[in-house]
């Protein structure tokens, strides 16, 4: 059965996973609560599967040239009404691998993220800068004030 990128991304979002990993010869993997898990019913990926996934998503000729020259490229990919994804495609051990980070359409509020209420008040100030820092996967890209 050929690899279905659309199915894998829909599974990622439905399962509330954070990342999709495409690496030969593993089946597609999703990161759920910090652990990598196989997407049920999928088979190990072939070189044609990972190359096909990149070709399906990457339509910018400049980015494609960058990928061919540098053996790595970062870009974004969107599925309307579902989510946006930050994509890193790279060569690993002579084959193409892909990691995609989901960026949900619905952004959580300060309250939903259990941040101190002072954050909302500080955001209303006319001058200054507020830095919110954290580790990868801690939800910082989801903050909307």
Q: Where are these predicted regions, by residue range?
A:
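Short, conserved phosphate-binding/catalytic loop or strand-edge motifs used
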Residues: 30
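ATP-binding Walker
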Residues: 138
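P-loop NTP-binding catalytic core
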Residues: 33, 37-42, 48-51, 55-133, ...
